[in-house]
Amino acid sequence: MGRFHKFPLLGLVLFLGLTGSLIAANEYACSSTDIHFTRANFPKGFIFGTATAAFQVEGAVNEGCRGPSMWDVYTKKFPHKCNYHNADVAVDFYHRYKEDIKLMKNLNTDGFRFSIAWPRIFPHGRMEKGISKAGVQYYHDLIDELLANGITPLVTVFHWDTPQDLEDEYGGFLSDRIIKDFTEYANFTFQEYGDKVKHWITFNEPWVFSRAGYDIGNKAPGRCSKYIKEHGEMCHDGRSGHEAYIVSHNMLLAHADAVDAFRKCDKCKGGKIGIAHSPAWFEAHELSDEEHETPVTGLIDFILGWHLHPTTYGDYPQSMKDHIGHRLPKFTEAQKEKLKNSADFVGINYYTSVFALHDEEPDPSQPSWQSDSLVDWEPRYVDKFNAFANKPDVAKVEVYAKGLRSLLKYIKDKYGNPEIMITENGYGEDLGEQDTSLVVALSDQHRTYYIQKHLLSLHEAICDDKVNVTGYFHWSLMDNFEWQDGYKARFGLYYVDYKNNLTRHEKLSAQWYSSFLHDGSKEFEIEHEFEHDEL
């Protein structure tokens, strides 16, 4: 991506002298002059946690009557698309959840986001074809263990693991038949766990699921048109510029029906439900001319508004209707009413920011989600800017914490200051040949610095911009199966030794996060290799 220059390693000790207007319940948090940056600088009741997803951590794919998911089949059918890795064992969270909850306790976290695997509950996708009692009990045991340790569960109903039987029967989310089946499954989880779980997410990253799986084909089920750059030659079927919109339309309708069921669930009273969105923040490229000042907001409509606009206002953003035309499905008036205000909070998975440039000449004969947005955000433009050239050699993405604050302020202003939870935020790295070196892997200076800067940016959004953020979940508790990267990308606070019994090892970032969540008394000198201290 951008050109990266190594600078001498710098020490960082965070000192916080924070002032500002007082927020009623957050008076101490936003007026503290304590030099130590700790959780006390955040509002009372703010949840700090970590996050995982069932397919990425559980393993045990053939235990407890679990059925196959779309990703099980994808990793076996196209092993080259996932670095020849699969999640049959993953990090064995299915068997080790109790010891992993002890790690959460060591971190001083009070929240944990995890997903329920649809085929572990309904092995064949529908209740009439059988319920796995072992699967149902597993999640009861997990939730009970979390609660016994004072950890609040945040449950994702669907994190990309469509039951393969539904894929085979009617194409999964390509068919509107999925709406009824998903709603049945979601309602089952609400009725089963709703008295214990009060924070729910229907869908994780519907934008990524739709675009990556059905428009560029680099995630399951790997569908795209042959003309898609980089991935087209690897796609065996699909129709870019069409299928992603159908899939997302069905997800939105399934979300609306599931939320309706949730709000009618007696056990679920007092609970909240939403979607975990995954927008980057976008800055206008310096090559953008003045007549095109809207590439940033236009692209945010396509990446965030695609799903947030309907669940707030009942319909797609006007920019999407204008650019996509007849290929964008339409909602009926009844569907619009059901979608409107169908989220109690907005989940945000934030990792990075990107530059956006108006795309003058998309080819109408080769439609795709990106060409429809009329915005080019190719990484090649990054080297023209110093501000975003913050990417150590091992990092998976550019790092820009200011983008988080900008994004949150945008959501506040455009969507009526909703409650927001940071449902994922994390730093991934590929250590290459040094991946098995504990000395290198555990000294994760960059991740520690990343967390610090993003928490500072989050604090500014809450205290200076008055954004209503109520929780932060770091991705991830531990290294795990990272989709097309397999096990090469590491995002965890704990290192998982894949060659030695999946042993967990505490990283420097885990030590810092634990201290931050305790009292911040332990000072760390953090080394970093970012070109500018603008994160």
Swiss-Prot record:
Pfam families: Glyco_hydro_1 (PF00232). Residues 1-24 form the signal peptide. One of its GO terms (molecular function) is beta-glucosidase activity. The active site is at E205 (proton donor), E424 (nucleophile). Its EC number is 3.2.1.21. Keywords: Disulfide bond, Endoplasmic reticulum, Glycoprotein, Glycosidase, Hydrolase, Signal. Disulfide bonds join C224-C235. One of its GO terms (biological process) is carbohydrate metabolic process. PROSITE patterns: ER_TARGET, GLYCOSYL_HYDROL_F1_2. Belongs to the glycosyl hydrolase 1 family. PANTHER family: BETA-GLUCOSIDASE 20, GLYCOSYL HYDROLASE. This is Beta-glucosidase 20. It comes from Arabidopsis thaliana (Mouse-ear cress).
